[in-house]
């Protein structure tokens, strides 16, 4: 097993999705469907194909078993009986049972009016009560895969009709609400079955993109020359009595959740660099002494991403050594990072493990028979059971949703600490690049992310404990899997917004950290040279150097510690600290060797020297500030993985460092955008997969891409496969 199981899985799924999207086809055989294939059909117009001889033979044998049993003395549910709590009825003519089933199930709320609006890729633009088209496409491919296992007595002709709908871009408009996922997702699947029947009162989208239109199922079938399907014995039940909608949407959810959870490790690296963290908490020894696989994987990813950083210290783990290669933070303060950074491997690790388990549960469900009753191809028997109960999916998506909340809580805590100048080790309030008394850059993001996290936390509550008895008390327990999956997808949207906001803020924080650190590096070198001539003669060069170093240290600490001040005041306070240390040995730091050299100045001379130093600092800062905003040098100082994510935002998306009030859009300004517009650009890049593409690429570049496919194509429960 890979030492990085979630990352290995994510890279495998990412590669497979690319492969299938480029190929344009997915061959279904009933036992090796994976979440990447579901996403390829749902989101990338990949076409499912069923042409395997064994599959077709299974379908034929299954229907033959049903036909023989139909004529026998055994009572078969849904063939000789009514449905659910009405199964005690025995219709004289069972040929109309499928029609009766469709009538009882096609009861969802869809306000269908004003449909003559071309160019809509999703019916939700017109019918907000409907499922997204991608969910319906995913549902269709999953139901096909479940049915072709040969246990549902579905004819090959019926499977071909479903495949033809997908190929012709005919997507049923399915109500968003109304499924309790007990006897499967009856109601959503009935609208797909109704489309096959050519119902004039079920609507579909036909075509995609600008050519999409909404028409009736009857008209859509007519346009492609497809005859309405007359459902055979038990076929109506076989189409609807399964977990396909829950499993399909859970597949999309887990794919996105895996990517967002991994991205949180990259974001934590960016925040660590923005905060100039002391990252000995990533040392392998810590994970070895508490060997949870998720914790170990998180730490390993973050170490690789931070490699080469000049903004963090302690990457090699020496607890007593906090020296950075660049002066990037004050010497005082906490000797170790606060919990949102220091315990991030311990916080994120369990989420990695839960999401891996959720993926496993969903993968099994994709390749399971979900129906009742089931035909046994080996014995010819028909078995009544409850494989339609989607509780495995509920279990999976509730783990995912809880994990998303935990990831969101960590990112929220990191971000609000990074924006707060009283906690961020020397960065300006709200990450303002200009004077913080009038400019508030990321303050609104702090509020936004709190709002997102509040909603995310609300959504993380369990759905399964809200089960209501339904359908004549026959479905007294029901999984609510689709409902739980819907809220999980909403949680994914919210976490995506949080990731976008935190990425924007972290890039700003890294820019500011580098801008101020490089300013101090430059100005203190020139200041040391200018002040050296003022020191009295007769002292050893080593003593003079020590005195100047102590004064420079005082200046740097004053600069970082007064990040909440405007530039003019910050320069004054730093100048005072510098001169005080030169003139008063008691102001030297206690952990430095005793200083023997100091200036003997009158109060007036001290003020004059302070003014000179302040003026020097002010001129140097404004020059450096302007040059840095014109051409930031941040990428030269950050880790290899962080650099890739930073440059994705700065170069690929063209999102610049926020310079302050001068960047606010106003009438007549050209090319300026609100902070929200830039965050929205990042969010769009998260939704369409571009950010994870960059993450995956750099993950391989920094040595994290080794490993196999993690079993994503392995057959689930192979001992039950039908050969």
UniProtKB/Swiss-Prot annotation:
Ordered alphabetically, the record's keywords are: Cytoplasm, Lyase, Phenylalanine catabolism, Phenylpropanoid metabolism
Q: Where is this cross-link: 5-imidazolinone (Ala-Gly)?
A: 182-184
Localization of this protein: Cytoplasm
User: According to its UniProt record, what is one Pfam family this protein matches?
Assistant: Lyase_aromatic
Q: What is its main location?
A: cytoplasm
The catalysed reaction is: L-phenylalanine = (E)-cinnamate + NH4(+)
Q: Which PANTHER family match?
A: HISTIDINE AMMONIA-LYASE
The UniProt family comment states: Belongs to the PAL/histidase family.
Question: What's the name of the protein?
Answer: Phenylalanine ammonia-lyase
Q: Which organism is it from?
A: Cochliobolus lunatus (Filamentous fungus)
Question: What taxonomic classification does the UniProt entry list for its organism?
Answer: Eukaryota, Fungi, Dikarya, Ascomycota, Pezizomycotina
Gene from which the chain derives: clz10
């Amino acid at each position: 097993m890979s030492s990085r199981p979630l990352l290995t899985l994510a890279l495998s799924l990412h590669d497979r999705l690319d492969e299938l999207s480029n190929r344009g086809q997915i061959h279904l055989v009933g036992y090796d469907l994976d979440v990447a294939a579901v996403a390829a059909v749902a989101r990338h117009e990949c076409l499912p194909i069923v042409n395997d001889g064994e599959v077709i033979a299974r379908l034929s044998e299954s229907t033959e078993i049903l036909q023989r049993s139909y004529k026998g003395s055994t009572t078969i549910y849904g063939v000789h009986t009514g449905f659910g709590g009405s199964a005690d009825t025995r219709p004289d003519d069972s040929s109309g049972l499928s029609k009766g089933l469709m009538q009882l199930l096609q009861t969802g709320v869809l306000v269908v009016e004003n449909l003559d609006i071309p160019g809509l890729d999703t019916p939700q633009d017109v019918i907000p009560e409907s499922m997204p088209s991608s969910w319906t496409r995913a549902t269709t491919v999953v139901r096909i895969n479940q049915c072709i296992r040969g246990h549902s007595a579905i004819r090959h002709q019926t499977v071909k009709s479903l495949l033809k709908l997908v190929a012709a871009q005919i997507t049923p408009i399915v109500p968003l609400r109304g499924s309790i996922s007990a006897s499967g997702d009856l109601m959503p699947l009935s609208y797909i079955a109704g489309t096959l029947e050519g119902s004039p009162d079920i609507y579909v989208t036909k075509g995609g993109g600008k050519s999409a239109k909404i028409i009736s199922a009857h008209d859509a079938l007519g346009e492609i020359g497809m005859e309405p399907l007359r459902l055979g014995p038990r076929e109506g039940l076989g189409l609807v009595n399964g977990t396909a909608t829950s499993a399909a949407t859970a597949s999309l959810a887990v794919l996105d959740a895996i990517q967002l959870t991994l991205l949180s490790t990259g974001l934590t690296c960016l925040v660590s660099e923005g905060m100039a963290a002391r990252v000995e908490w990533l040392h392998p020894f810590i994970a070895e002494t508490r060997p949870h696989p998720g914790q170990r994987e998180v730490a390993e990813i973050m170490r690789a991403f931070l490699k080469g950083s000049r903004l963090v210290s302690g990457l090699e783990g020496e607890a007593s050594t906090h020296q950075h290669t660049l002066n990037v933070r004050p010497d005082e303060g906490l000797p170790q990072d606060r919990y949102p950074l220091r315990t991030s491997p311990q916080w994120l690790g369990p989420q990695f493990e839960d999401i891996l388990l959720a993926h496993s549960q969903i993968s099994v469900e994709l390749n399971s028979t979900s129906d009742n009753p089931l035909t046994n191809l080996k014995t010819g028997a028909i078995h009544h059971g409850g494989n339609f109960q989607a509780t495995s999916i509920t279990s999976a998506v509730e783990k995912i949703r809880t994990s998303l909340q935990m990831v969101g809580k960590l990112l929220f805590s990191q971000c609000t600490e990074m924006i707060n100048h009283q906690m961020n080790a020397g960065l300006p309030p709200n990450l303002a690049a200009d004077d913080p008394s009038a400019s508030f850059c990321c303050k609104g993001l702090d509020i936004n992310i709190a709002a997102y996290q509040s909603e995310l936390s609300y959504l993380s509550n369990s759905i399964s404990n809200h089960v209501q008895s339904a359908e004549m008390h026959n479905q007294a327990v029901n999984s609510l899997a689709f409902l739980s999956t819907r809220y999980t997808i909403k949680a994914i949207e919210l976490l995506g917004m949080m990731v976008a906001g935190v990425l924007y803020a972290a890039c700003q924080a890294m820019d500011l950290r580098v801008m101020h650190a490089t300013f101090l590096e430059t100005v203190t070198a020139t200041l040391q040279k200018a002040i050296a001539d003022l020191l009295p003669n007769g002292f050893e060069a080593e003593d003079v150097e020590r005195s100047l170093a102590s004064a420079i240290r005082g200046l740097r600490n004053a600069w970082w510690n007064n990040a909440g001040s405007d530039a003019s005041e910050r320069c004054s306070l730093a100048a005072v600290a510098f001169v005080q240390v030169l003139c008063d040995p008691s102001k030297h730091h206690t952990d430095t060797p005793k200083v023997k050299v100091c200036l003997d100045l009158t109060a007036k001379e001290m003020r004059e020297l302070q003014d000179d130093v302040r003026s020097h600092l002010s001129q140097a800062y404004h020059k450096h500030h302007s040059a840095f905003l014109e051409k930031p040098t941040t990428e030269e100082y950050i880790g290899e993985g962080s650099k890739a994510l930073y440059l994705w935002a700065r170069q690929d998306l063209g999102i610049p460092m926020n310079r302050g009030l001068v960047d606010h859009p106003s009438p007549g300004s050209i090319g300026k955008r609100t902070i929200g517009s830039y965050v929205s650009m990042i969010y769009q890049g998260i939704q369409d997969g571009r950010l994870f593409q960059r993450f995956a690429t750099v993950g391989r570049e920094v040595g994290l891409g080794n490993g196999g496919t993690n079993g994503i194509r392995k057959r689930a429960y192979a001992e039950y496969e039908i050969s």
